[in-house]
């Protein structure tokens, strides 16, 4: 008889979907919807497995494969257990059905990020210390190394470029100048240095209210 683990997808503190996870004969996790508890779906939702997969950082992103493996996130159920499928794109998250965790306990918007995870995501230096899993790094897409950092009350995305020329941050900065002429409400990018590397950085433009 297959062991069944039960989970809940929530929007902040509102349960949205109950679902189950079993393991097939190859030990791979398989997810099945049990019951929708709200009359809406996350934007772009097609099916449960693809929705959850899309919340996981791609392994081709620089330094992220090692970070995912370090935390036991190399399969999708491990990812859910460690990260709760949190993202700075929206307010959906996952917890075991028996868990008493609340949105205030896990929210990336409200809680401090683990600084060591941010540094590992940016430069590949992975500490052997026990780390907190409150971090947006596990769910951030893209190819080049990047990390989320707090500057006072605000959250910024730091993005590096290729190891050889580092022209990508400059290109992004220049593109933002053009965009500002065309659209006054475009996202602003600045240039800076982080650990001696040229970066582009932009302020987070989502929130708990706007995704």
Regions found by a protein language model. Give the residues of each.
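Phosphate/dinucleotide-binding and metal-coordinating scaffold of catalytic cores
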Residues: 1-211
